[in-house]
A protein has these predicted regions:
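Internal glycine-rich alpha/beta core junctions
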Residues: 1-110
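Glycine-rich cofactor/substrate-binding loops
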Residues: 66, 81-185
Length: 185
């Protein structure tokens, strides 16, 4: 481990902007893949939030809920049901974010059970890890754009199917006006 050339390790450490020098080269070698896995876990956490938001947007945009309406630019029609609006952009964002959530596991599986040192296996981590930053940024940008253009159905509670949603509030109101709880309920 290390180098067979007489390097000034202090100067190299300073030139590269590291705070301290790793005196134990074995420790430095044993860290391969660990930092990437930690960062990948942060990426996966953000992606999980975006995927859940995308799922909710798809659900709440559906005709069964209709809580929100997505702009036409973010949807496509169905060949068999032209009136249907498929939330393509949110569906693709959800899939991309779900893919990003697999990144820590991919890194773990590649780096797992390798002996100390550098092996070509670790090259595959870079192929997965480095593009993930751009992929996450694209998802963040797309969600930011979509959220700003979602229309909320402000009159959804006028629908009779939601009458029971506020039944507890109605019971409490009746109790406060003197109706016994059992009668109010």
């Amino acid at each position: 481990y290390g180098s067979s050339f007489p390097l000034n390790r202090t100067q190299t450490t300073d030139s590269l902007g590291f705070e301290t020098m790793d005196y134990n080269v074995v420790y430095a070698q044993m860290g391969r893949g660990k930092t990437e896995r930690i960062v990948a876990s942060a990426i996966a956490s953000i992606a999980a939030t975006l995927a859940k938001l995308a799922f909710d947007a798809c659900l709440y945009n559906s005709q069964n809920f209709a809580f929100i309406k997505l702009p036409d630019a973010f949807t496509t029609g169905s060949s068999i049901m032209p009136h249907k609006k498929n939330p393509d952009v949110f569906e693709l964002t959800r899939a991309k974010c779900n893919k990003l959530q697999a990144l820590p596991y991919q890194i773990t599986l590649i780096a797992n059970n390798l002996p100390s040192g550098y092996f070509r296996d670790l090259q595959i981590i870079k192929e997965l890890f480095l593009p993930s930053f751009d992929e996450l940024e694209e998802c963040l940008d797309m969600v930011d754009l979509m959220i700003s253009q979602i229309a909320v159905n402000e009159h959804i509670l006028d629908d009779k199917r939601y009458d029971y949603m506020f039944s507890v509030e109605e019971v409490n109101r009746r109790v406060q006006t003197g109706t016994p709880f059992r009668d109010a309920y």
